[in-house]
Curated annotation (Swiss-Prot):
GO cellular component: cell outer membrane
Keyword Signal: yes
Protein name, UniProt field: Outer membrane protein 26
Major subcellular site: membrane
Gene: omp26
Keyword annotations of the record: Cell outer membrane, Membrane, Signal
């Protein structure tokens, strides 16, 4: 009796496995990088982000130039004091020379402290700008990738594909159809992208 149960279970397992293996699977490939690069909304998104961040970037560039100009002016100021001291040194007493050197050192230290503060503020603004820019780019990139995923899913369901794989992650495949262009064509363009065409 045990043998009959084993043979029946084995036969049933083989029948199920062969039936599953013989089911036709349709496999398709897409080049996700190509689709992303040629997405109908990609340029509109890039233009939108550029318009959003260009004024801030220009303001930061102007602020950096202002800081650089202040650094140059501070150096010139200290260098002028040093040059004046060198010129006057032969006529001055040693105590007067030391006093003026201390004044120059104090002036240099005060200028350095002020400039360090300005540079730190500038660096903080730049870091905040970069973080905000990266966040917005990630948000917009996510929207584009979502639309690619939706278009791929819809096309795969409509055409009856069992699997859709990224062609860049496949080492070898015996069969499959490249549906990259079909997916790209099925992505609806936003109104802004259509206006640019």
């Amino acid at each position: 009796m045990k043998n009959i149960a084993k043979v029946t279970a084995l036969a049933l397992g083989i029948a199920l496995a062969s039936g599953y293996a013989s089911a036709e699977e349709k496999i398709a490939f897409i080049n996700a990088g190509y689709i992303f690069q040629h997405h109908p909304d990609r340029q509109a998104v890039a233009d939108k982000l550029d318009a959003e961040f260009k004024p801030v970037a220009e303001k930061l560039a102007a602020s950096k130039k202002e800081v650089d100009d202040k650094i140059a002016a501070a150096r010139k100021k200290v260098e002028a004091k040093v040059a004046a001291l060198e010129k006057d040194a032969p006529r001055l007493r040693q105590a007067d020379i030391q006093k003026r050197q201390q004044e120059i050192n104090k002036l240099g230290a005060a200028e350095d402290a002020e400039l360090q503060k300005l540079m730190q503020e500038q660096d903080k603004k730049v870091q905040e700008f970069q973080a905000q820019n990266e966040k917005r780019q990630a948000e917009e990139r996510g929207k584009l990738l979502d639309s690619i995923q939706t278009a791929t899913n819809n096309l795969a369901k409509a055409k009856g594909y069992t699997y859709v794989l990224d062609a860049n992650s496949i080492v070898f495949a015996v069969e499959g159809k490249d549906i990259t262009e079909e997916v790209l064509k099925s992505i609806p363009a936003s109104e802004k992208a259509q206006e640019k065409k």
